[in-house]
């Protein structure tokens, strides 16, 4: 069992892990995504959440295109978070505190700190893959694969 509480022993097609992209469930909501309140709400509904993490001047923030919301280290250690480091300082901090994290830009695959394979859309899947899907159609299609999970703005439709 890893820090997010997941193991690889599971039923893939009927029990795929659903990871909300930045706290979105039914499509992008730029006004609320990556906000602490939205993330807590989505976790309370039973979803995992991918968040974008920045470190600027030894302070930790979340936000997609820029550091927006100042947060605490305790926030990052919540179960069900997948922390996407947006700069090297954030990656170093996340690794130092033991948060579940990863770094990628345009890679087809990247390994998370808990040994999952963060997978770019349309790439080959494995039982360790968590695939990123950009549309509801992509999200629906991946549900019948052997992927461990799916990260999308549309995972609310999958429950």
Language-model features and meaning:
Residues 2, 7, 12-159:
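Phosphate-group recognition and catalysis centered on beta-loop-alpha active-site segments
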């Amino acid at each position: 069992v890893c820090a997010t509480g997941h193991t690889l022993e599971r039923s893939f097609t009927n029990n795929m892990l659903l990871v909300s992209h930045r706290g979105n469930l039914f499509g992008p909501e730029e006004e609320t995504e990556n906000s602490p309140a939205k993330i807590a709400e989505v976790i309370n509904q039973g979803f995992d959440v991918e968040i974008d993490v920045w470190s600027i001047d030894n302070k930790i923030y979340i936000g997609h295109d820029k550091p927006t919301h100042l947060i605490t280290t305790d926030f990052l250690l919540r179960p069900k978070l997948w922390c996407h480091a947006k700069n090297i300082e954030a990656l170093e901090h996340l690794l130092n505190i033991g948060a579940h994290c990863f770094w990628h830009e345009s890679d087809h695959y990247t390994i998370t700190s808990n040994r999952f394979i963060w997978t770019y859309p349309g790439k080959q899947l494995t039982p360790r893959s968590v695939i990123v899907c950009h549309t509801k159609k992509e999200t629906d299609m991946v549900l019948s694969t052997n992927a461990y999970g799916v990260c999308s703005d549309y995972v609310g439709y999958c429950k």
